[in-house]
């Protein structure tokens, strides 16, 4: 686990992109405006909690996995299945370049995350969500934020 954290840090440094780390309430507003609250039955708290445990709200987070694939961005979306890194064996189900998932504009990341939830029938794709968010009271995640 420590190695994954170091690789994430290295990935952030290598990208050359300026990292943006959102606040919980700013993400709550963005996610709410994007229609994530209760998308496929998952409350806004689920999305905020998941993003925290996947990336620490860091838009440029990257984690290199043992199989050589890379998880990208605020939702840590994997290059093998969901985005295009330039390799021929990648599936690219979201029809998006992986580089589009590590920008401060979260539009492509949100569209892809919605697709993942829809196609995989839930949020089990994200290990951070399964370990820290699933089945818990997540009302605290949007507490104090100006969202309905």
Curated annotation (Swiss-Prot):
Active site per database record: 54, 71
Glycoprotein as UniProt keyword: yes
Signal peptide (UniProt feature, chain positions): 1-19
Residues annotated as domain C-type lysozyme: 20-148
Cell compartment(s), UniProt: Secreted
Residues with glycosylation annotation: 58
CDD domains: LYZ_C (cd16897)
InterPro entries in the record: Glyco_hydro_22 (IPR001916), Glyco_hydro_22_CS (IPR019799), Glyco_hydro_22_lys (IPR000974), Lysozyme-like_dom_sf (IPR023346)
Domain of life from the UniProt record: Eukaryota
Name of the protein this chain belongs to: Lysozyme-like protein 1
Keywords, ordered alphabetically: Disulfide bond, Glycoprotein, Glycosidase, Hydrolase, Secreted, Signal
Enzyme Commission (EC) number: 3.2.1.17
PANTHER family: LYSOZYME C (PTHR11407), LYSOZYME-LIKE PROTEIN 1-RELATED (PTHR11407:SF62)
Organism from which the protein derives: Homo sapiens (Human)
An example Gene Ontology molecular-function term: lysozyme activity
């Amino acid at each position: 686990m420590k190695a994954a954290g170091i690789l994430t840090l290295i990935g952030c440094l290598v990208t050359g992109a300026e990292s943006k780390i959102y606040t919980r309430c700013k993400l709550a507003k963005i996610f709410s405006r994007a229609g994530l609250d209760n998308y496929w039955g998952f409350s806004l708290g689920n999305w905020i909690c998941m993003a925290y445990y996947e990336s620490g709200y860091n838009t440029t987070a990257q984690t290199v996995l043992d199989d050589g694939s890379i998880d990208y961005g605020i939702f840590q979306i994997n290059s093998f299945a969901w985005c295009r890194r330039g390799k021929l064996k990648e599936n690219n189900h979201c029809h998006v370049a992986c580089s589009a998932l590590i920008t401060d504009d979260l539009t492509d990341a949100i569209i892809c995350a919605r697709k993942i939830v829809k196609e995989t029938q839930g949020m089990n794709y994200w290990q951070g969500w399964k370990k820290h968010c699933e089945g818990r009271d997540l009302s605290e995640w949007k507490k104090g934020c100006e969202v309905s």
